[in-house]
From Swiss-Prot:
Presence of keyword Transferase: no
Gene3D superfamilies, A to Z: alpha/beta hydrolase
GO MF assignments: phospholipase activity; triacylglycerol lipase activity
Name the record gives this protein: Putative lipase ATG15
Chief subcellular location: membrane
Annotated EC: 3.1.1.3
Stored CDD domains: Lipase_3
Catalytic activity: a triacylglycerol + H2O = a diacylglycerol + a fatty acid + H(+)
Enzyme class: hydrolase
Pfam family, one: Lipase_3
Active site (UniProt): 409
Alphabetical UniProt keywords: Autophagy, Endosome, Glycoprotein, Hydrolase, Lipid degradation, Lipid metabolism, Membrane, Signal-anchor, Transmembrane, Transmembrane helix
Length: 552
């Protein structure tokens, strides 16, 4: 029998201890290697899937945490204003009140709308599931099956994008299945100070100032002699660092595109109240339809439960030419006002173009007086926006109500101009540069206004060629559609989501859509975009604008 002494036993334990010390570090390294490898694989998979356009859309649109938050601190659609434009219809101005009786009257239409939206959601979810399945096969499938699977993936992606483009009710995916006419949208505000003209709401005061400013060609020395009285008002402004508030205002901008019910009674104007010049249907005009099918500008009015906050949502450009809305009924007048507001000279891009006014004189020379007169015509959208505001204030006194303005695309630019005119907080989405139009209109600007009192915010993304001011040139999508979008300079703050750098997006006109902004951008980012003041900027620098007073 082998006998081990205590001394030998101690020596053996020491040897085992030394051997353990030599073996332990490699074991720990192996364990750490496995953990790090697993983490890298998980992170890579998550990042790869996150970059997928389909994943981005449905991560927040079909399973979004953005929900209605009850009645407190919410906004709901209460009125729709329609203002006719054009030489024939610009005096027509009607208001539709979205009352409980109105909702009950058209309940069948709204229920059908909700049902069809829910069906669209289910169909898109099925496409999304097939897309995710193909994604996994592409990433982890055998090499010999890669080309076949990738082709299938592209096919599913094409089907998905095609399905999204048939959004019949022009409604964001995050709100699919909800009635646009009774949805309650949460918002947050914060206190601030607004410096604005004291007598701005007196009848014809603003119009008289603008007419005089145009008559003196905006001469600052002459205008300063008027000594406009500016005051600092304590107001509530939208909290633009709150994502729900940004989504709410974007939804209001989108809501202005939504179709609403029209039947024989609507065509007889039974639901509309005349707030204009007493227009009455007659034998020559009894076929005029208000709302979406008629030419003109529309404003959707959302009101808080306590009636202390009112938001005016101005409809933007309709039609396939500039995606944003889904229908073509108002495309002609939208295009005219787009080309008037955002081109250097009446959309005189080339000799083949049809201009929207007669201000062009010769090569890169334009009549400034003519341009300013065209913008102030009563049948243009800017004047229509002023009338909508005045009719809103007839219901909700501006002395006791916080009035905000929002809009998308053309609607966003008009919202900014309206906000500048009356000193209203404004949040514009993907609006073309409106600084040139502001100068041509000679809108009043508070002297020595600190930047922290600037309440104009432009929400945009770097993949939108219209917002970035690059949708021009002979081969651009805008030019091919007949739009002369030549401006890039905005006023106020710019809050830009850099989707090109962050997600590898390419500049594409489809990224101008308000639905893309809501579903694929704002809701995807964890925080709202940082806002910076507009850097020095000048549009149409190669043009010469002459006045009748100029001596050549």
């Amino acid at each position: 029998m082998l006998h081990i002494t205590e001394k030998e036993q101690t020596r053996g334990l020491r040897q085992l201890e030394k051997r353990g010390k030599r073996l332990l570090p490699p074991l720990i390294k192996f364990i750490w290697f496995c953990l790090i490898s697993a983490a890298c694989v998980a992170a890579t998979t998550f990042y790869w899937l996150r970059l997928s356009p389909v994943h981005n859309i449905h991560k927040h649109s079909l399973n979004s945490s953005f929900e209605d938050k009850g009645e407190d601190g919410t906004l709901q659609l209460k009125h729709i204003f329609h203002h006719g434009v054009g030489e024939k219809d610009y005096k027509i101005h009607k208001r539709l009140d979205v009352t409980q009786e109105y909702l009950i009257k058209h309940s069948a239409y709204f229920q059908n709308m909700v049902n069809e939206q829910q069906q669209e959601v289910q169909e898109i979810q099925e496409i999304h599931k097939r897309h995710e399945k193909q994604e996994i096969q592409v990433k982890y499938g055998p090499d010999q099956e890669y080309n076949q699977t990738n082709t299938a993936l592209n096919s599913v992606g094409t089907e998905y994008k095609s399905r999204l483009s048939t959004n019949e009710y022009d409604w964001p995916d995050v709100h699919r299945g909800k009635n646009p006419f009774d949805i309650q949208l949460p918002f947050k505000n914060k206190q601030s100070i607004a410096r604005r003209i004291k007598h701005r709401n007196e009848p014809f005061f603003i119009e008289s100032y603008l007419d005089y400013a145009r008559s003196v060609n905006g001469d600052a020395l002459i205008l300063n002699r008027i000594n406009l009285e500016w005051i600092d008002d304590d107001i509530n402004i939208p909290n633009i660092t709150d994502k729900d508030t940004i989504v709410t205002l974007a939804t209001i901008s989108s809501n202005a595109y939504v179709r609403f019910p029209q039947n024989d009674d609507d065509k007889k104007k039974s639901d509309w109240t005349d707030v204009g010049g007493g227009w009455i249907p007659d034998e020559e005009n009894n076929d005029v339809n208000f709302g979406w099918e008629d030419v003109g500008l529309r404003g959707h009015i959302f009101v808080s439960k306590d009636n202390k906050t009112v938001v005016i949502g101005i409809k933007g450009t309709s039609g396939a030419g500039l995606p944003g809305g889904g229908s073509d009924e108002t495309t002609k007048n939208d295009k005219t006002n787009d080309n008037l507001l955002f081109s250097c000279c009446c959309a005189r891009v080339g000799y083949m173009w049809t201009t929207v006014c007669d201000c062009y004189e010769k090569a890169y020379t334009c009549n400034q007086d003519c341009l300013e007169k065209e913008l102030r015509r009563k049948d243009r959208y800017y004047e229509a926006a002023l009338d909508i505001y005045k009719n809103v204030t007839a219901i909700y006194p501006p002395e006791t109500t916080d009035i905000w303005v929002t809009g998308h695309s053309l609607g966003g630019a008009l919202a900014s101009l309206l906000g500048r005119t009356y000193g209203l907080p404004t949040v514009a989405y993907e609006a073309p540069g409106e600084m040139l139009a502001l100068k041509r209109l000679h809108l009043p600007q508070a002297p020595g206004l600190p930047r922290h009192l600037e309440h104009i915010w432009h929400i945009g993304n770097t993949a939108d060629p219209i917002y970035m001011g690059v949708c021009n040139g002979a081969s651009s999508s805008c030019s091919l559609g007949g739009y002369a979008m030549e401006t890039a300079c905005h006023t106020g703050y710019q809050c830009v989501y850099d989707v090109v750098t962050d997600y590898g997006w390419r500049v594409n006109l489809l990224n101008h859509r308000i639905h893309t902004v809501i579903d694929d951008i704002i809701l995807v980012y964890n925080e709202t975009a940082p806002c910076v003041y507009q850097a020095p900027c000048r549009d149409c620098f190669n043009w010469r604008f002459v006045s009748h007073d100029d001596k050549e």
